[in-house]
């Protein structure tokens, strides 16, 4: 499903989000969302990626998960 390059790219972006590099990090606590997204990427779990996409309150995290879904050509929930 995912190449090692894709995993590296996604996990790097998650690290940036965890470091608070994105604007809505200060508005919302997305720690749990990031934890589950990271797990979904490591385990290549489409279900976890879709769940984070559908349930997060963070617009930037939603956009990021949407990008993953589109890049992997999987259907959203």
Curated annotation (Swiss-Prot):
Keywords: Antibiotic, Antimicrobial, Cell cycle, Growth arrest, Host-virus interaction. The keyword GTP-binding does not apply. GO terms for biological process: defense response to bacterium; regulation of cell cycle. It comes from the Viruses. Interacts with host homodimeric histone-like protein (HU) hupA; thereby replacing dsDNA from the HU-DNA complex. Acts as a host growth inhibitor by inhibiting DNA-binding of microbial histone-like protein HU, thereby preventing chromosome segregation and causing filamentous cell morphology and growth defects in the host. This is Inhibitor of histone-like protein HU. It comes from Bacillus phage SP01 (Bacteriophage SP01). The gene is 46.
């Amino acid at each position: 499903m995912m190449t090692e390059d894709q995993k590296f790219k996604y996990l790097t972006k998650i690290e940036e989000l965890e470091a608070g590099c994105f604007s809505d990090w200060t508005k919302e606590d997305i720690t749990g969302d990031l934890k589950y997204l990271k797990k979904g990427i490591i385990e290549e779990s489409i279900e976890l990626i879709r769940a984070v996409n559908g349930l997060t309150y963070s617009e930037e995290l939603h956009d990021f998960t949407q990008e993953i879904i589109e890049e992997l050509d999987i259907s959203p929930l």
